[in-house]
Swiss-Prot record:
Protein name: Large ribosomal subunit protein uL13
GO BP: any one term: translation
Record gene name: rplM
Oligomer and partners: Part of the 50S ribosomal subunit.
CDD domains found in the cross-reference section: Ribosomal_L13 (cd00392)
Keyword vocabulary terms for this entry: Ribonucleoprotein, Ribosomal protein
UniProt xrefs under PANTHER family: LARGE RIBOSOMAL SUBUNIT PROTEIN UL13M (PTHR11545:SF2), RIBOSOMAL PROTEIN L13 (PTHR11545)
Superkingdom of the source species: Bacteria
GO CC terms: ribonucleoprotein complex; ribosome
MF annotations from Gene Ontology: mRNA binding; structural constituent of ribosome
Reported function: This protein is one of the early assembly proteins of the 50S ribosomal subunit, although it is not seen to bind rRNA by itself. It is important during the early stages of 50S assembly.
Amino acid sequence: MRTIFVNEREAVRAWHLIDAAGRPLGRVAARVACLLRGKHKASYTPNQEMGDYVVVINAEKVFLSGTKPKDKMYYRHSGYPGGLKSVSFSALVKRRPVEPLRHAVKGMLPKGPLGRKLIKNVKIYAGSVHPHESQNPVPLSC
């Protein structure tokens, strides 16, 4: 019996809706990354874009346990000497509410061209309103 490989053009893609309100950041990000990769499908192929589209709402209401909201730091570097910038989770959520979740999901995806394609398939919104109603996303729990 031969192994059947599904082509990227033949892959059936669904839309999923995840409400992140009151859920841990890592659990939501892990579920989103799994759906983006397509690991929940029998036709999973690690080198192809086989995953589904994911819409995440209420990203600003995601939480971290303990003292992590003030202790967890996000770093970036300008490329110049002394150009290391850091911001805490709580400060980042106030300024850019979707960024911590996007950053966590991106870290769970493959690095390289496939990961850059996959991160475009997730749509993250701070509130509960999103413009993807016409795609009829299926609500999921994490």
